[in-house]
């Protein structure tokens, strides 16, 4: 659903069809709690927050925050802030890294920005390759000369850096996107 949301978002932006945010609102608010336990469910926070921005329904904002704080995903508020390196699927890392910075953008709560910035630093310090994308041959793979990454890491990393740019207004995030796209994109 998280990636499908992007297609719906694009359709809404092109057409203004109000049925789209209404359907997403209904979907997210009626999604059974027992079905929100998959590791990658947390990526849906992107769509939940976008839908909140369109509808103004505070229940969506509350859902996004509560899902992040109770998440059983590999990236959590707690491990974003600790000093341990991440050992997780690289594409999932690139996708989930946007969640705390999006929560900061929508709530203004500094603890989310702090988590996002520290998680990004930890990820990049241990895994950034010369072409501007973190290594990931399935899992984060360090900075070995033979380390590589998958094509989906390129798109997911640049997409997430776009949210860092929007949330902070700091142009260094645009530099990261440019480096990634000019050096690593096919």
What name fits each language-model region?
Residues 1-186:
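Glycan-recognition and catalytic cores of secretory/periplasmic carbohydrate-active enzymes
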